């Protein structure tokens, strides 16, 4: 079994070092964020989950310029939609710029247009809804963590740059002194530049940080017993999670059945 240390993930005894490193990382790349997007500074993606709440708190503590954005996927749990609205109202009162971006098409409309549902290997919904970036050359920051899955352990690091919109020639760096200079030098020419301050946090570190900072979290975790905050019936969720969501939100199940019937009918009409 690969240990957290081998994966470069902080264990629960590393909380102080983890938060200090995260804030240092945010401060280090603020000049880059301001040069690429002077109006907004960093653009911080907010989903309404625990990781996102930790991320915004770290940005507030760092004292840098940033804008928080939330992409309305049209498939979020209603409680999450209300929670995001509440947090944005609170942060806006503190002078933090917050933006909710609504898509041109809903999830249902996109599926009808494509005549298919998303699945694990073709998650077009993420590309068009969840991962939409309104400011192409900004420095983005997300609350992704390597400990969330084996896939993220292999892909996600503190600094990510990609040379083209199609994400070719991916450059991934850990936040250390040798990588810091290279990342700063490269970022001015790369279209895609992301800072992930909590990429190396374990779930234990995240939960200890929430307790230490007394952070408010989305009520869905306690109310529904969920482990994740995301779209209802997401193909990346486990079968167990999707079955539980189907029981909790039967109205969405009916809509999915309607969608499947409509897609099947439109395909038959084309044939």
Predicted regions and their residues:
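Nucleotide-activated chemistry modules centered on ATP-dependent adenylation/adenylyltransferase
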Residues: 1-271
């Amino acid at each position: 079994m690969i240990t957290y240390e081998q994966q470069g993930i902080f264990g629960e005894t590393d909380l102080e070092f983890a938060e200090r490193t995260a804030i240092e990382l945010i401060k280090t790349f603020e000049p880059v964020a301001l040069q690429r997007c002077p109006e907004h500074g960093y653009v911080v993606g907010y989903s309404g989950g625990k990781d996102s709440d930790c991320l915004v708190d770290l940005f507030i503590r760092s004292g840098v310029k940033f804008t928080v954005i939330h992409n309305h996927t049209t498939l979020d749990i209603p409680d999450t939609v209300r929670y995001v609205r509440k947090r944005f109202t609170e942060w806006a009162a503190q002078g933090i710029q917050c933006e909710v971006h609504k898509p041109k098409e809903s999830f249902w409309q996109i599926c009808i247009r494509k005549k298919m549902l998303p699945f694990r290997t073709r998650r077009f919904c993420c590309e068009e809804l969840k991962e939409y970036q309104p400011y192409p050359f900004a420095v983005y920051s997300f609350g992704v963590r390597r400990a969330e899955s084996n896939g993220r352990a292999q892909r996600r690091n503190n600094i990510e740059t990609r040379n083209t919109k199609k994400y070719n020639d991916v450059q991934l760096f850990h936040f250390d002194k040798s990588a810091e200079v290279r990342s700063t030098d490269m970022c001015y020419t790369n279209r895609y530049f992301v800072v992930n301050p909590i990429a190396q946090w374990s779930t234990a570190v995240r939960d200890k940080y929430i307790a230490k900072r007394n952070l408010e979290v989305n009520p869905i975790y306690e109310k529904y017993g969920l482990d994740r905050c995301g779209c209802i019936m997401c193909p990346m969720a486990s079968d167990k999670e999707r079955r539980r969501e189907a029981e909790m939100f039967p109205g969405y199940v009916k809509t999915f059945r309607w969608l499947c019937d409509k897609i099947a009918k439109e395909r038959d009409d084309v044939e």
